[in-house]
């Protein structure tokens, strides 16, 4: 009996995690008139494999070198999965910025994040909470994190497509 309860609880929590992202503040309506959105990443409050970002950077010497690839992996997946409704870029200036606020990165590379859509003056226009991306099963820590970024991008891209179509 207890085995079945544990199994049911696990299935329920897995289903919640798979559909966890939701718009918890504001509206995405402003994006309908935009052609591009700048994307930045914020690790300032992140716990990365039980370490702060600074501690993880000491442990993993390629952390700062690999960050452009990590954000690029996320952006590529968002652009593709959203059906190219918007052009997301880490380098193009825009009226709006999407701030990827990473909360947790687990050993598996799973990433839990919030996303904030901010106007040019820094006002938060919308918040998308609890976006979960699954990391990789094999490889180095950075490889698993990159897999988590891709998965996060897929989830966010599908969310944008659903919300903006």
Describe the role of every protein-language-model region:
Residues 73-84, 155-163:
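Structured segments of extracytoplasmic/periplasmic soluble domains
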Residues 81-143:
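Surface-exposed short loop/turn segments
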């Amino acid at each position: 009996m207890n085995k079945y309860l544990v199994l049911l609880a696990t299935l329920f929590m897995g289903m919640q995690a798979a559909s966890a992202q939701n718009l918890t503040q504001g509206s995405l309506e402003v994006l309908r008139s935009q052609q591009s959105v700048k994307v930045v990443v914020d690790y300032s409050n992140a716990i990365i494999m039980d370490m702060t970002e600074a501690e993880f950077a000491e442990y993993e010497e390629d952390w700062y070198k690999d960050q452009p690839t990590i954000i690029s992996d996320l952006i590529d997946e968002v652009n593709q999965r959203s059906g190219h409704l918007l052009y997301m870029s880490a380098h193009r200036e825009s009226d709006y910025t999407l701030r990827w606020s990473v909360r947790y990165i687990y050993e598996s590379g799973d990433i839990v994040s919030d996303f904030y859509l901010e106007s040019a003056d820094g006002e938060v226009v919308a918040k998308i909470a609890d976006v979960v991306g699954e990391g990789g099963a094999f490889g180095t820590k950075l490889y698993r994190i990159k897999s988590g970024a891709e998965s996060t991008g897929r989830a966010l891209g599908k969310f944008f497509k659903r919300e903006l179509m």
